[in-house]
Structure formats: structure tokens, C-alpha cells
Amino acid sequence: MSSFDYLKTAIKQQGCTLQQVADASGMTKGYLSQLLNAKIKSPSAQKLEALHRFLGLEFPRQKKTIGVVFGKFYPLHTGHIYLIQRACSQVDELHIIMGFDDTRDRALFEDSAMSQQPTVPDRLRWLLQTFKYQKNIRIHAFNEEGMEPYPHGWDVWSNGIKKFMAEKGIQPDLIYTSEEADAPQYMEHLGIETVLVDPKRTFMSISGAQIRENPFRYWEYIPTEVKPFFVRTVAILGGESSGKSTLVNKLANIFNTTSAWEYGRDYVFSHLGGDEIALQYSDYDKIALGHAQYIDFAVKYANKVAFIDTDFVTTQAFCKKYEGREHPFVQALIDEYRFDLVILLENNTPWVADGLRSLGSSVDRKEFQNLLVEMLEENNIEFVRVEEEDYDSRFLRCVELVREMMGEQR
């Protein structure tokens, strides 16, 4: 590789032509071309400085120690973080290269206990968010499609990664890994010294496979930015005075986690003076958006499971009941937010007037319950009915349902 390959990479990243770079740097295009190809034995320091200044590069260029970490990060865990933190403190610049292969990644998901498959952007986001304050870390995605899965296919993979690093201008001095068996392979195929970090897992005994098989068992090893992805969501539905809010609070207490309150009630107080008489069609999208924000907050800080008081189907049902039509924005959120467990409470508990309820008759309550069921089925949402009439039995039944759901990963 030429000693000026980094300049070629910088020019490519700028998106400039050689003529534009030459003009801006006070040299001819021919001189620049010869310079980039190391044909000029003693290039002008003044021209080099102008070129570096135009490209936003340091001059004179200081020799940097470059490190690289390879991984799938499927998912990112604290073992990865320990490796990366150790590596980035030993080099001037650390490149994290995340490999992805749609076929392989799909197979890993299907053989796991994960409730959803992480996308490539999900995995990149975990890395970017976790290391966003460390300016010497660079993150890349490398397509490994068609390459034999690890630990096979070293020849094909090494040729691919060499080409990828050359395109990105990455010239590593060191590779960091916790996999003892990989060190000689890296040296043989890439010719780069490898530094082993905690290969015996004495400090951080965890692997991506363990988390994929049982996320909740290894919850403490899942980073803060990754945990929301694994959180299970439980939505409690029902008509007015069915005990949803109290039940959600009790469940969140017993499972030591977060809950999302029904935003519609807060909206009525903050925007309508505490009286639904002023509610109109144009309010429903705002109510749905506010509820989505409550849900996102609850999921972000949840301990394995988050409980949701009322879903968007219920919001849509009220819109249809009072306004005679459905709202497209609410429907979009119905499609976007799918919960792991939906519990529909039967309307067979005493109706309590609280100033915000208007469907108190047995006929109204039954009609609304039927509307909920109809809309859940229309949207292909699976749900479990809880028909116990006393509050304690309802609570115990819901605890049982949640434990069954969580038991898949315990």
C-alpha cells in the first residue's frame, strides 16, 4: 500500500475530483496524481500542508496506533463492551467492524428465545449509542453474505475484510479479541498482531449465544441501550371501570418494573379542562401520540417487562364510538405497536363514576366490550380474556399469564 493511500481515501470521502483538490491545494492535477501514487520522492511541504488543510487532515501527520474489533454483536453484551473499552484505551483509533449476513442472522434468531429479530440498524444503533462519547471509536457494518459462517471460511472472509478495510482506509496495527482460537488465524490470513482480552472470561463470563438462548437469565449482562429491545410488553384492555389502571399498577409493583398510564386521561385534564365534553376527532391523534411516548418511556426503563394501561385499539374504539369513524393516525400506531401479551378484562366488575366515564349502563358496557373484541380481531391481535369477577382473582390470573409469557426465557 502507498504511504499516501489515506489521502486517496480522504479525497473519495470528500466527493471531490482530483482537479478540484489540486486547484484548492495550489498544485497541478498531474503533480497531485504523482504525489498520491508515491512518484514524487521529495514532495513540497507547503503543498502537502495545503492538501491536508483542504481535506481536514492533521499535518504533519502523526503516526497513530490503529486497532480493530470484529464481531456480530448479536446482541451487544457487556463482554463486548469490556473488550472494546480495553482496546480503545490502548490505541489512538479503534474501528469496530460489525459483520452481518441476512441468512445466518435469520438462522440465529430462529434458533433463539428472542421474541423479535434485531435488524442491522438495531445492532449499529446499540454500538453507536453505547460508544457515542468516545471519539476515537469508529463503527462500520460489513456484509458477510455468501461467506461460510464462523469459524469456517477464513480465506474468503479475510479477502473480503481486506478489501473492505482498504476501501475505508483502515490500516490496523492490532486486532483485539477474546477468542483464543482466532489469534493465529488473524495472523495467518491478515498478518496483523492480535491482542487477547480476557480469553478465559474471568472478568465477564458471557456470550451472545447465552443471551440469545435466555435473555432474562442473563439480564445483567445486557447493556442499557440494548435492554429495551428485549423487554416484553403486556397491554391491559377493557371498558370503563374494568379495573385496568389499578391492575397495571399492581402488576408493575409485583414485577418491580415500569408501567405506562393511560395518556387519554392526562390529556383530558391538561387540554380539555378535565371534561370530555370538549373532546373532538382532532384530539385522537394527539392522545395516541402521547400514549406512544408513555409506552416508549416505560419500555426504555423496564425491568424485563412493561405494563401498558390501554392500547391503541381502545383509543380507536372510543374514536369510533364517539366520532362515528376511525382515525388513520391511530390505526398507524395500532399497526406499529404490537404487544407480547394482550389481556382483555371482562366488564363484570362494579362501575364506578369518576367524572370521566360515560358508559355506565350494562348495555353500553357490553356494546363497547363487543366493539373492542371486534376491532382486536379485525387487526389480527391475539388476546386473552380474563373473566374473573373479583379483583383479587383477576390480579392472580394476570400474574399467572405474565409468568407463563416470561417463562419462555426463564
Swiss-Prot record:
Q: Which NCBIfam families match?
A: cyt_tran_rel (TIGR00125), nadR_NMN_Atrans (TIGR01526), PRK08099.1 (NF005988)
> Start and end of every HTH cro/C1-type domain?
7-62
What does the free-text pH dependence field read?
A: Optimum pH is 8.6.
Assembly and binders:
Homotetramer.
Where NAD(+) 1 binds, per the record, is at 70-73, 77, 104, 144-157, 177-179, 204-206
Q: What reaction(s) does this enzyme catalyze?
A: beta-nicotinamide D-ribonucleotide + ATP + H(+) = diphosphate + NAD(+); beta-nicotinamide D-riboside + ATP = beta-nicotinamide D-ribonucleotide + ADP + H(+)
**Activity control mechanisms:** Feed-back regulated by NAD. A high level of NAD causes NadR to lose enzymatic activity and repress several NAD synthetic genes; conversely, a low NAD level activates the assimilatory enzymatic activities and leads to derepression of biosynthetic genes.
Instruction: Note down the stretches annotated as region Ribosylnicotinamide kinase.
Output: 230-410
Q: Which organism is it from?
A: Escherichia coli (strain K12)
Single biological process term from Gene Ontology: response to alkaline pH
Q: What is this protein called?
A: Trifunctional NAD biosynthesis/regulator protein NadR
